[in-house]
Amino acid sequence: MKLIILTGLVLFAIVSLIEAEEESGRVCIPLNEECSKSPDKCCDNINCDCYLRFEKGVQTGRPCFCTEKDVIFERDE
C-alpha cells in the first residue's frame, strides 16, 4: 500500500514539473502583440516599443507592442 502511495506522489511531482517547464517556455509575447504590462517579455529578436497617445491634446494612454528590432515607424501625413 505504501508503495502505491509513494509511486502516485512521484508521478504527481513529475507531471507538475513538466507542466511548469511548458508554462515557462510559453511566456514570451509574439510579434505585434501588446506588451504594455510586461515590456521585457517579447520573444527573441523583438523589442517592446511604446508610444504616447493623445486625443485633443490630452494624453490618453501609452500602448506598447512587440515589434521587430531596428525597424522605425514614421507617421504618414
Swiss-Prot record:
Q: Which InterPro entries does the record associate with it?
A: Spider_toxin_CSTX_knottin (IPR019553), Spidertoxin (IPR004169)
> Where does the sequence pass through the membrane?
none
Q: Which UniProt keywords apply?
A: Disulfide bond, Secreted, Signal, Toxin
Predominant location of this chain? secreted
In its record, the post-translational modification comment is:
Contains 4 disulfide bonds.
Identify the tissues in which this protein is expressed. Expressed by the venom gland.
Where does the record place it? Secreted
> Which positions form S-S bridges?
none
Q: A Gene Ontology CC term for this entry?
A: extracellular region
User: What Pfam families does the annotation carry?
Assistant: Toxin_35
Propeptide at 21-26
Q: Which residues form the signal peptide?
A: 1-20
A GO molecular-function descriptor: ion channel inhibitor activity
Q: Which family does it belong to?
A: Belongs to the neurotoxin 19 (CSTX) family. 09 (U10-Lctx) subfamily.
Name under which the protein is recorded: U10-lycotoxin-Ls1c
Species of origin:
Lycosa singoriensis (Wolf spider)
Q: What is the lineage of its organism?
A: Eukaryota, Metazoa, Ecdysozoa, Arthropoda, Chelicerata
